[in-house]
Amino acid sequence: MTFYNHKEIEPKWQDFWAKNHTFKTGTDSSKPKFYALDMFPYPSGAGLHVGHPEGYTATDILSRFKRAQGYNVLHPMGWDAFGLPAEQYAMDTGNDPADFTAENIANFKRQINSLGFSYDWDREVNTTDPNYYKWTQWIFTKLYEKGLAYEAEVPVNWVEELGTAIANEEVLPDGTSERGGYPVVRKPMRQWMLKITAYAERLLEDLEEVDWPESIKDMQRNWIGKSVGANITFNVKDSEESFTVFTTRPDTLFGATYAVLAPEHALVDAITTEEQAEAIAEYKRQASLKSDLARTDLAKEKTGVWTGAYAINPVNGKEMPIWIADYVLSSYGTGAIMAVPAHDERDWEFAKQFHLDIIPVLEGGNVQEAAYTEDGLHINSDFLDGLNKEEAIAKTVAWLEEKEVGNEKVSYRLRDWLFSRQRYWGEPIPIIHWEDGTSTAVPEDQLPLILPVTKDIHPSGTGESPLANITDWLEVTREDGVKGRRETNTMPQWAGSSWYYLRYIDPKNDKAIADPDLLKQWLPVDIYVGGAEHAVLHLLYARFWHKVLYDLGVVPTKEPFQKLFNQGMILGTSYRDHRGALVATDKVEKREGSYFHIETGEELEQAPAKMSKSLKNVVNPDDVVEQYGADTLRVYEMFMGPLDASIAWSEEGLEGSRKFLDRVYRLITTKEMTGDNSGALDKVYHETVKAVTEQIESMKFNTAIAQLMIFVNAANKEDKLYKEQAKGFVQLIAPFAPHLGEELWQVLTDSNQSISHVAWPTWDENKLVENDVEIVVQIKGKVKAKLVLAKDLSKEELEAAALSHEKIQAEIAGKEIVKVIAVPNKLVNIVVK
């Protein structure tokens, strides 16, 4: 039986594409542009897994489709190659992280090429290449000049095992590090911060301009966390000191019965009484060991210590005890809250635990039993009594401003971006600290500041990076003899990925990030495909940098990525025992269609789960390509289900996709071709062209493949195939199965040209219309027959056809026809007696 020999055909066309630079980015300025971007991978030692090609195949189908439609297509690939894993490996083995990274990139590239993706490799970027990170450093110097990069002594999320601080976004809900799962503690350190908060409002507003999944927009909105309220000043009793509180509910000020400061608040030591000093110091020490997430966990028991001091409530002059508690963060708002326990669950729990006053100021509920958090008219609130929420907020803010003890305020949950890492394998931060106390950026003509090669990349132990150990690199002298030290912190992995999509546009430019005319031509990115896990990290950081570059006049658009699509996760096959515990696949055997634990004999339930080394259910694409071919993997991953759904991997599904490609191969290579069109396949062919075109546009790849299958089934029923329709069909399947597409195009055309730039087929709407219709024939309103007749017959023709039908003649034999009602294209009703 004829079948598709992938082991021969796929390498042949991969060589052809490489030699002929088939996918070189078009530069014809008369053509429209299409920029299709994948989230570039971190080149890990493990190589690609089958989850990577899902998103890559989607952008590849779009890229091939758009080329055929006459677009200039920019479809690049590169490497996000700085980061902790390579450094950790280097520390464990003594090898250079650069060598390890280069080996991993070579392996990734081999795997990617084996899958037939149409990348323009002339535009490859690598974040660890000095010619690339020169511009990462240049962007940093611009941030520094604009006051958007600054140093601060801040409590950081310190991970002892990693020897570095990590960003809030990299701390997991259980208070451990995203990488490695190590304990995270709070520790004050000198750090570089980026002022992303200066762009909070624009980052929020401009989400309206982009075509992104609403779920991702919501995650960014929540992360930015805009809230409108008021700042209120509280004086400390018997003291010159005061502190400010931000609240979204200034109207509940009459119900504020105590205040809470973050343990790190600058005022704590100044107002603490002698009697409370020891307890306060111990509490501060314990709080410093916890991450922000652990401190704000709603389920944890409320803890706190009274400072011994009181604040004066400005609206009624009442004394409010001032406490410290770790659920208040110094980094959020002002680091101080006014507690209204009657109407806030956390404040209520705290008040109950420490026997503090609870005064209701809104109607409804029993505040001795639980906090009342619904809205209601105001009570116990003097000039606010009887007002609703909106009226009371407006009146309170006016009162605060009149008395000069507060003002309306917009606050954001978003914090500035902790940008420094105490590691070796990252971009050096181009700053020099001079002994006269000043700091300067490395001048542009001295960039890139090269990361020095060293064998000793262990953390310095002082909290500085290993670069602090390399004195000949570290120490510099100015022309006037003033000595200085280079910045020893390096940038986080997020730095290089915050602007890489710009470098693809002009990757060899040594005078600028990219030529301004080329940036104008290619931006914004038309489609960006990647995982939803990057919603508030990479995607927010890239938008921030893009807006800074927009303000500098470097880029012409406000937003980098016009359309974002998150592919789903490909789950592995896994097995659960009666307790719900997962069992590794090498401990499972299949008997008579059921699955059993090899060691215990227990019958197991098959269940999809995330692929992981521990479950031994990771599928390596190399194995799939070897056994089934790259085109099979591509078609299978697109046919599994909707692109954004999470779906379990299935060998049976893979085999089904392979069989389909074999049927396609047989159809084109063995069916007799003809130059005469019988018209038999016109309708299904034009339906297929239309459906596949529209479904690729809308990224419904699974339904596009289903339509291709419908055409193959119909074509197999015919003795001959109209050659032009066969060619059109091969063009339709080529973006999904490009090696097969090229091979069959060659079979049909005897051409040695690639199918890649052949114009996309078009459909004829007239051919989609049915020429025949089904006519229902009724006698006295009851259906007696259904006739297939030519469309648009006259009433007389319909009547004649109905009355001459043998079944109808038998029904009306011996009866008198009273009248015949004919409705064109629908029915004939015969009335008899």
From Swiss-Prot:
Q: Which GO terms describe its biological process?
A: leucyl-tRNA aminoacylation
CC annotations in GO: cytosol
Q: Where does the motif 'HIGH' region lie?
A: 41-52
EC number annotated for this UniProt entry: 6.1.1.4
The top EC class, named as a word, is ligase
- Can the keyword Aminoacyl-tRNA synthetase be found in this entry's annotation? yes
Gene3D superfamilies membership: HUPs, Isoleucyl-tRNA Synthetase, Domain 1, Valyl/Leucyl/Isoleucyl-tRNA synthetase, editing domain
Q: Give start-end ranges for motif 'KMSKS' region.
A: 610-614
* UniProt-listed Pfam families: Anticodon_1, tRNA-synt_1, tRNA-synt_1_2, tRNA-synt_1g
Protein keywords: Aminoacyl-tRNA synthetase, ATP-binding, Cytoplasm, Ligase, Nucleotide-binding, Protein biosynthesis
Q: Which cysteines are joined by disulfide bonds?
A: none
Q: Say if the entry is tagged with keyword Ligase.
A: yes
GO MF annotations, alphabetized: aminoacyl-tRNA deacylase activity; ATP binding; leucine-tRNA ligase activity
Which reaction is catalysed here? tRNA(Leu) + L-leucine + ATP = L-leucyl-tRNA(Leu) + AMP + diphosphate
- Detail which positions bind ATP: 613
Fetch the CDD domains from UniProt. Answer: Anticodon_Ia_Leu_BEm, LeuRS_core
Localization per Swiss-Prot or TrEMBL: Cytoplasm
PANTHER family with a match to the protein in the record: LEUCINE--TRNA LIGASE, MITOCHONDRIAL, LEUCYL-TRNA SYNTHETASE
The UniProt similarity line reads: Belongs to the class-I aminoacyl-tRNA synthetase family.
What is this protein identified as?
Leucine--tRNA ligase
The protein's organism comes out as Streptococcus uberis (strain ATCC BAA-854 / 0140J)
Upper taxonomic classification of the species?
Answer: Bacteria, Bacillati, Bacillota, Bacilli, Lactobacillales
Gene from which this protein is expressed = leuS
